[in-house]
């Protein structure tokens, strides 16, 4: 007999404001438990040191988490100049201390180097894998392995302030960009070394900063529900963003009710006005209910790629 999943069928996205000092997986599990969700997944880990936006997908929304992983991000970062650490942040050991001898003009010139399309060699202290093992495990054993430079794009790099030896920047970048590596490379260009002492992710894709909630806020709502003898979902579920917001930048294709049953069985259906080889967001009928994503195939038909399972939101045991 197949095991029944624990938790309730609840679909949506929580914009968690992760606190410092905890792993992204720890935060994810707390959110999953608060919502009593049967499935949950995050959309790009933040270092324990980092705070800020961590979209958590619940239920069927997990099917679209990859699209948020691939999206642009924005960070506010403060670096301490004059010290380089083995992890490029304040969680590591200081390996070199040097005086600050650069001018303001040299700093601005160095910042310009990181704007636009560049190549970045990932830090050894990252979750990227080499021969099946995360790089940080090699680093902890004092082993350095070869890493290939990867293309990244820094759309914006804004100077915020330089107060003493602390430099603050606002960075809007493509997926896979390591802010710690930018800071480490910047420190070497300036000849003084640098490491991250504060990192906050302020944006993922199009999601608004003011929609974030903390674990403490979620915990308080659960406690309030218990105190008032309410189901906690009555207070928590209003915080969920619709799961189709994960693919809001995909063009919408509306499938008429007459073709809906065929589509939901995984069959391709004919819809006019589609562009070949482009992912689209599929809605059904006059209600325009989101049911997944698809792409036009070689026969000019809309082929579903990922469809959601429609639940009645009843609790599973």
Swiss-Prot record:
GO biological process: mRNA pseudouridine synthesis; tRNA pseudouridine synthesis
Record: active site: 47
E.C. number: 5.4.99.25
Cystine pairs: none
Catalysed reactions, semicolon-separated: uridine(55) in tRNA = pseudouridine(55) in tRNA
Transmembrane domains' residue ranges: none
SUPFAM superfamilies documented for this protein: Pseudouridine synthase, PUA domain-like
Matches recorded under InterPro entries: PsdUridine_synth_cat_dom_sf (IPR020103), PsdUridine_synth_N (IPR002501), PUA-like_sf (IPR015947), PUA_sf (IPR036974), tRNA_psdUridine_synth_TruB (IPR014780), tRNA_sdUridine_synth_fam1_C (IPR015240), TruB_C (IPR032819)
Keywords, comma-separated and alphabetical: Isomerase, tRNA processing
Pfam families cross-referenced by the UniProt entry: TruB-C_2, TruB_C_2, TruB_N
GO molecular function: RNA binding; tRNA pseudouridine(55) synthase activity
Function: Responsible for synthesis of pseudouridine from uracil-55 in the psi GC loop of transfer RNAs.
Family from the record: Belongs to the pseudouridine synthase TruB family. Type 1 subfamily.
HAMAP family: TruB_bact (MF_01080)
The protein's name in its UniProt record: tRNA pseudouridine synthase B
Organism of this sequence: Shewanella sp. (strain MR-7)
Gene: truB
């Amino acid at each position: 007999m197949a095991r029944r999943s624990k938790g309730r069928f609840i679909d949506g996205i929580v914009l968690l404001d992760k606190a410092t000092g905890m792993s992204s997986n720890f935060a994810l599990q707390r959110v999953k438990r608060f919502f009593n969700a049967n499935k949950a997944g995050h959309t790009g880990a933040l270092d324990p040191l980092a705070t800020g936006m961590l979209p958590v997908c619940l239920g069927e929304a997990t099917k679209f988490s990859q699209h948020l992983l691939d999206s642009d991000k924005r960070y506010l970062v403060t670096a301490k100049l004059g010290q380089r650490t083995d992890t490029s942040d304040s969680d590591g050991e200081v390996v070199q201390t040097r005086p600050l001898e650069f001018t303001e003009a040299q700093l601005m010139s160095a910042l310009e180097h990181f704007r636009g399309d560049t190549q970045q060699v990932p830090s050894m202290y990252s979750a990227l894998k080499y021969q099946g093992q995360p790089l940080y495990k090699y680093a902890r054993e004092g082993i350095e392995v070869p890493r290939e430079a990867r293309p990244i794009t820094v759309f914006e790099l804004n100077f915020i302030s330089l107060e003493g030896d602390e430099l603050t920047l606002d960075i809007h970048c493509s997926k896979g960009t390591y802010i710690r590596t930018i800071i480490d490379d910047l420190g070497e260009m300036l000849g003084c070394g640098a490491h991250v002492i504060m990192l906050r992710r302020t944006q993922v894709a199009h999601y608004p900063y003011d929609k974030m909630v903390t674990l403490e806020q979620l915990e308080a709502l659960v406690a309030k529900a218990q105190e008032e003898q309410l189901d906690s979902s009555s207070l928590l579920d209003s915080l969920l963003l619709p799961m189709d917001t994960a693919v809001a930048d995909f063009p919408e294709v509306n499938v008429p009710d007459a073709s809906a049953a065929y589509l939901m069985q995984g069959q391709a259906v004919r819809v006019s006005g589609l562009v070949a080889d482009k992912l689209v967001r599929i809605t059904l009928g006059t209600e325009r209910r989101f049911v997944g994503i698809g792409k036009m195939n070689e026969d000019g038909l809309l082929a579903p790629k990922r469809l959601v399972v429609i639940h009645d939101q009843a609790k599973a045991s």
